[in-house]
Design a protein with these regions (language model features):
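Post-signal peptide N-terminal segment of secreted/secretory-pathway proteins
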Residues: 54-150
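Short glycine/acidic-enriched loop and turn motifs that connect beta-strands
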Residues: 46-50, 93-96, 141-144, 193-197, ...
């Protein structure tokens, strides 16, 4: 396995066609429509056809195909964050920058600035916006949390984490990744890279006072390892304001590191010792060989209803992992509270697939399948049925999506 591909996969949760694909003369069967602001934003990676990505506004999800006419080119494996009508493209493991776009009334996006996050490596781990004048972004290799003004995209401060108090096993490089703000405490997932993307054992999370921007303490739980994911971040809260921390277990390459979800209950600042949703140390019905190697991306739809992609090692090709062409990933529906789950009746997709979101009764999955096409497939929560072809077709792999 090539280390470059493995590191880029960290964006997946860690650039089919030539540049002319974004020209208005392409073969999109439906022209862009003028129906107001885009109601969906897609982040698409174009590998293996090209080493680039696109941020694509979609005005009308009833159109059968995604038009790239108004797309903005970015680096490979892009991810998204939003605030009001601002859309941010996060570089993940391919680009040190965060790019800002504004959603326009005519369905387009206007680029409105950028900021370099990590000044030591082409990486921007995750970001979140607090308000019009304050946002955070993580620089995993520089070991800093960058504070910036999201209106002007200017750096206003930083939190230096290069300290053995926040590292593991004597290291002073905690490698901050995911961010989540709850009750004025900034929760920061720490990669604790040993030899990236292999991490030191345990799920390490740093708590920061969001008023003073001073670290409060570091917590660790050794039941799972590698807290939060480059690009995706993936922490979320439920209706109880309980915080869930995803752990990807060094992709399953370290035997005693496991993948799944841990919890910090509402009003608490330590891991819940009574909760651990271990996704890799179990046997799954409907999965070839019964085992998953890791999970990177999750989507919480409410009332304990959780969706995710699971990587199955049974479908790795003879020449080793090919995260773009091997169809290794199953789509799952799970019960967050009972720690149970089932495989959904979708065709399998590639290892880069990360995009899951929902609108009302429809759950959208970005899939790149062997024989059923590529694009957005839908699970109907009312009828419990899965589409067997994309409701919206696109080129490339959808890495992330926002639905308005």
């Amino acid at each position: 396995m090539k280390m470059k591909n493995l590191i880029l996969l960290a964006v997946s949760l860690l650039g089919g066609f030539a540049l002319t694909s974004c020209d208005s003369s392409n073969d999109d069967p439906l022209p862009p429509m003028t129906e107001g602001k885009a109601n969906m934003i897609l982040a698409i990676d174009m590998a293996p056809q090209a080493s680039m990505g696109y941020i694509v506004p979609v005005q009308n999800t009833s159109n059968g195909n995604v038009s790239f006419t108004n797309a903005h080119e970015v680096k490979s494996t892009p991810f998204l964050a939003t605030y009001k009508d601002w859309v941010f493209s996060i570089g993940g493991a391919a680009d040190a920058n965060v790019y800002k776009f504004i959603r326009n009334d005519d369905g387009t996006l206007t680029k409105a600035g950028q900021i370099q996050v990590d000044r030591m490596a082409p990486m921007a781990g995750n970001m979140l916006v607090v308000n019009d004048t304050k946002a955070y972004a993580t620089a995993p290799i520089e070991n800093k949390i960058v504070i910036f003004n999201p209106t002007t995209m200017e750096r206003t401060g930083e939190i230096d984490l290069a300290d053995s108090r926040w590292g593991a096993e004597g290291s002073n490089t905690p490698n901050p990744i995911g961010l989540f703000l709850r009750d004025n405490i900034l929760y920061v997932g720490l990669g604790q890279f040993d030899n990236m993307p292999i991490c030191k054992k345990g799920a390490h999370v740093l708590l920061v006072d969001a008023t003073t921007d001073k670290p409060i303490k570091k917590i660790v739980d050794y039941r799972l390892s590698a807290a939060t994911v480059i690009g995706v971040g993936a922490m979320f809260v439920d209706e109880k304001n309980d915080l869930y921390i995803p752990c990807w277990g060094s992709y399953g390459y370290v035997p005693d590191q496991y993948c799944g979800l841990l919890r910090i209950k509402n009003g608490e600042t330590d891991f819940d010792k009574d909760y651990c949703f271990n996704l890799t140390d179990r046997t799954w019905t409907g999965v070839e060989g019964g085992k998953l190697q890791y999970v990177l991306s999750y989507h919480y739809a409410g009332n304990g209803e959780l969706y995710f992609f699971g990587y199955c090692p049974a479908f790795i090709g003879a020449s080793g992992p090919d995260y773009i062409n091997d169809k290794t990933n199953y789509a799952f529906k799970a019960n967050l509270y009972n720690c149970t789950g089932e495989v959904l009746d979708f065709p399998r997709t590639n290892g880069y697939s990360c995009a899951i979101n929902h609108k009302d009764s429809k759950v959208f999955f970005g899939l790149v399948t062997e024989n059923n096409g590529a694009g957005l497939f839908v699970y109907d929560r009312n009828t419990k049925t899965c589409s067997q072809s994309p409701v919206i077709k696109t080129q490339g792999t959808i890495m992330d999506m926002v639905i308005y």
